[in-house]
C-alpha cells in the first residue's frame, strides 16, 4: 500500500513539475491590432471625404464639356449680331448634369448639376462671355449684348460660389454674372474659384 501511495504521489509531483516547466503563454497581438485599426480609421476619416470631393469635381467636368456646344452657339450668334441663344438646342439631362441654359440677352451659360454633384440650391456654375470694347486698341472687356456685333475674340470666365470679381487679364476685368453661381468652390475647377 505504501508503494502504491508513493507511486501515486510521484506521478502527481511529476505532473505538477511538468506544468510548472511549461512555457508561459506567448504575447498576443491584440493590442497591436487595435493600433492598426485606429490608424486605418484616421486614414479613412481623411481619405473618404477627399475621394467624395474628387468624384464631385469629375462630375463637374462633365457639365463643362456639355457647355462647350453652348459656348460655340454664343460665339456664332455674337459674330452675326443675332440673339445669343438662337439655334441652340440644350443637351439632354444626364445623371450628373440637370441642364445647360443660355441667357439670350447676355450669352451667360448656366450649368445646373444634379444632387449627385451638390445639394439642390447649391449646384449651378456660370460661364460669362466678354469681348474687347474695340477691335484695334481695346481698353476694357464688355459684356455681350443681344443684337450687337462683337469686336474681337470672346473670352470666357467661369464663376463658382464665392467668386465675386473677374480674373481676366488685360485689357481689363470682364463682367460679372447676372445670376450668382451657387456651386461650392471646392467642387469647381481652379479657374472658377475666387
Region locations from a protein language model:
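N-terminal leader/signal peptides at the extreme start of proteins
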Residues: 1-32, 36
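Periplasmic/extracellular, small/polar-rich flexible segments of pilin-like filament-forming proteins
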Residues: 2-3, 79-194
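Long hydrophobic alpha-helices with heptad-repeat/coiled-coil character
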Residues: 2-13, 42-51, 127-130
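Selective for proline/serine-rich intrinsically disordered segments
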Residues: 21-23, 27, 47, 127, ...
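N-terminal single-pass transmembrane signal-anchor helix
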Residues: 23-62, 66, 70
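Generic structural signal for short, solvent-exposed loop/turn connectors between secondary structure elements
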Residues: 28-43, 78-94
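N-terminal alpha-helical signal peptides/signal-anchor transmembrane segments
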Residues: 63-84
Amino acid at each position: 500500500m505504501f508503494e502504491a501511495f508513493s507511486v501515486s504521489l510521484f506521478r502527481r509531483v511529476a505532473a505538477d513539475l511538468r506544468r510548472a516547466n511549461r512555457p508561459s503563454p506567448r504575447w498576443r497581438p491584440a493590442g497591436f491590432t487595435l493600433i492598426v485599426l485606429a490608424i486605418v480609421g484616421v486614414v479613412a476619416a481623411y481619405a473618404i471625404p477627399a475621394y467624395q470631393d474628387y468624384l464631385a469635381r469629375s462630375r463637374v467636368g462633365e457639365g463643362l464639356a456639355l457647355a462647350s456646344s453652348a459656348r460655340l452657339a454664343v460665339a456664332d450668334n455674337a459674330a452675326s449680331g443675332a440673339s445669343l441663344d438662337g439655334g441652340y438646342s440644350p443637351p439632354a439631362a444626364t445623371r450628373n448634369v440637370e441642364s445647360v441654359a443660355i441667357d439670350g440677352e447676355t450669352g451667360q451659360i448656366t450649368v445646373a448639376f444634379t444632387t449627385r454633384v451638390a445639394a439642390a440650391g447649391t449646384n449651378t456654375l456660370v460661364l460669362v462671355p466678354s469681348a474687347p470694347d474695340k477691335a484695334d486698341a481695346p481698353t476694357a472687356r464688355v459684356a455681350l449684348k443681344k443684337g450687337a456685333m462683337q469686336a474681337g475674340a470672346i473670352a470666357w470666365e467661369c464663376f463658382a460660389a464665392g467668386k465675386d470679381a473677374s480674373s481676366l487679364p488685360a485689357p481689363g476685368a470682364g463682367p460679372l454674372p447676372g445670376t450668382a453661381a451657387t456651386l461650392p468652390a471646392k467642387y469647381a475647377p481652379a479657374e472658377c474659384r475666387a
